[in-house]
Amino acid sequence: MKNILLALLLFLNISVQAQQLVQGIIKDTETNKPIQYVMIIGNVSGKSTVTNSEGRFQFNLPAQDSKLIIKHIDYFTQELSAKDKKSFNVQMQSSTESLEEIVILKTSIKDEIEKAIKTSQEKFAKNLKLNTFYRELLYINETMYKYEDAEVDYYLQSINKNNVIVKESRSVKFSNETAKKFDSLSNIQYYWDDFKDNVLYEFNYQLIKNIISDKEYDLYITAKTAGDGTELYVLNFNPIDNAKKATLSGTMIYGAHDYLIREIKANLSEKYITNNEFTQQNNHRFKRSFYNRTTIFNLFNSNYTLAYTSYRIFGVSQVADQFTKVGGVMELLIDSIEENTTIPNQEKFYTRRNLTPLGKNYKTKYWEKFNVVPLTFKEEQMLKDINK
């Protein structure tokens, strides 16, 4: 028994030492401003994370990785030695010095983008298991109301079908005065859309499909060269001048030769923000005042996969004659991917729309093993009690 216990302790010690936590901040060389959505990739493992709005990142460096690849579409790629180093202050040089040129196609833009979508979907391996870190943060009347996160395995049989297993999770509602007042006045429970559908939505490129099919959007394509030398095309979309309902502006970036989609970004167009209307949700009507969505795909050693997606949405909720400011953050970070995985028994799959019913459903500090994208400094200060 002692030998077994000793072996177990030794194994645990080796597992902890097998990766080291490195942290850093990345800024623009010329402006000294932080750069968001920079990808940090292990040079052998291919594991990745991204920087937050403050340019900060943290990365559990696997033992086989000796370097970090620092990569952003608008900046020159860097490789940094990670040996015996725990913190980084990185300056990146912009690679976008010239204006992007308009691309004249031999086909329609809709056909061009549909080709990029089809090519990207065909590149995804079939029968996947994605080990992910999922997080959502809910604000009520501009005050933090609820926080949830989880280690979730997404099992994809195809780009149209998946199931999930929630391995461990946390759901915490804050007890500040704003939360107490809201609870005393309302029985409405706010939550993000079904978290089980997050991966399918991204693999289907549903937002882009909607945009290119909507006649209220002006579409054009430009060409640029990424910081690593890859030639890229950029789909630009904005509401047309007389748009009545269209509200989003953004880009979709894909390879000019391989047609693989690298990045999708969308924001509310300031010029057409008045087009926002109240829309019926599950249990209330909602009108957006802020919308920011970013999805990043990673092509590493010929393997193409979803790497990260995030949403920040704020607005006003209406229930009868009661109006409430509601919004928050949703993030999904893919940690590892297995191909041709065995599908678990059906009874192990989670079927609820959100994590709230699970409460505090964990035995380990699972969030520490992921390359979790740091929250803003203000949000982290408010969440300190949760991580104890």
PLM feature spans:
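Short Pro-Gly-centered beta-turn/loop motif in secreted/extracellular proteins
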Residues: 32, 58-65
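Surface-exposed, low-complexity/disordered segments
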Residues: 93-218, 226-231, 283-388
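Bacterial Sec-dependent N-terminal signal peptides
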Residues: 1-25, 40, 99, 388
